Amino acid sequence: MRIAYFITPHGFGHAARAAAVMKAIHQFHPSVHFDIYTLVPPWFFEESIPGIFTYHETLTDIGLVQDTPLEVDIPATILALQDFFPFNEKNLIGLEKELCQSNCQLVICDISPLGIAVGEKAKIPSILIENFTWDWIYEPYIKDHPQFIDIIRTIKYYIDTANYHIQTLPTCRPD
């Protein structure tokens, strides 16, 4: 069985969680092979899950553009998001073909809406795993940057499109 795993490159925490999930799945089903789609470098996965994945260098998510670990560049984030959404149809078709040709039977996404879109296009079930989603991260910026409204709407659509939604603890949510 092959599982496609789309992982946001915004920090290694998501990749660490994804590696732990893949390792646990592989322990229960040793025949599973993962196709990892991300910009997180492959060396990050090689030590924890060696030999059970194929790496595909893919921009799966924008997150926030940061000048430093604590400084966010909102105008650059908006530009990057407007370039990323809506998804490029040619890119979606290419990823759909890859998943179908490799006989992927499931798409798992660690907060990456791209994987959900590809799963939907390929008619492959998708699972969203998250402890936060980008829509609510962007919401406080709407007042000064209304460009986020359409971006948030698009992200919420894909969150709702996932066949399964797993929210992990601790959950980061606005109250």
Regions found by a protein language model. Give the residues of each.
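Nucleotide-activated donor-dependent transferases that construct or modify glycoconjugates
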Residues: 1-11
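An aromatic- and histidine-rich active-site surface loop
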Residues: 42-44, 107-122
